[in-house]
Amino acid sequence: MVQATDQEVNNAIEKVHIPPLKTQGIKTKLVPWIARYAAVDVDTVWVEPFMGSGVVGFNLAPKRAIFSDTNIHLIDFYRAIQNGELTAAGCRKFLESEGARLKSRGGDYFYEVRNRFNDSHDPHDFLFLNRSCFNGLMRFNRQHRYNVPYGHNDNRFSKAYVTNIVN
């Protein structure tokens, strides 16, 4: 196993980039440590069998990577980014608009969006739910319907928060 030096890790990962989705067990704090022990070079194909938020693979930034996960909505979300369906500007506009509705209508609006997502599986709605649900959970019932409750923060999507998400 090839181990990177501390200086190589610091040069490669000056700042850990936070992904747009919250997930349980996110490895943000472990990225520098993982980078130290994971040899990623031009010949490396990074394989991430349990993608989760993708924070490790995205920060290591290999030339070639295979990301997988059992959560199809997670995969569809990142595919939508990859194919240009989801953009930073589009997500900003969507989250600001939906955030204003959440602020005025509260939990009822959250559950309306949750029902809409369960019918359409729109990646914009997936992002909204992930950031406004209880504790950033991703949970689906046996019918494969998103069933996480509302996080009870009607003013969730402040401009600063939206900027953090889309950057």
State where each predicted segment sits:
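S-adenosyl-L-methionine
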Residues: V2-F50, V55-V56, L60
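Class I S-adenosyl-L-methionine-dependent methyltransferase module
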Residues: K63-N167
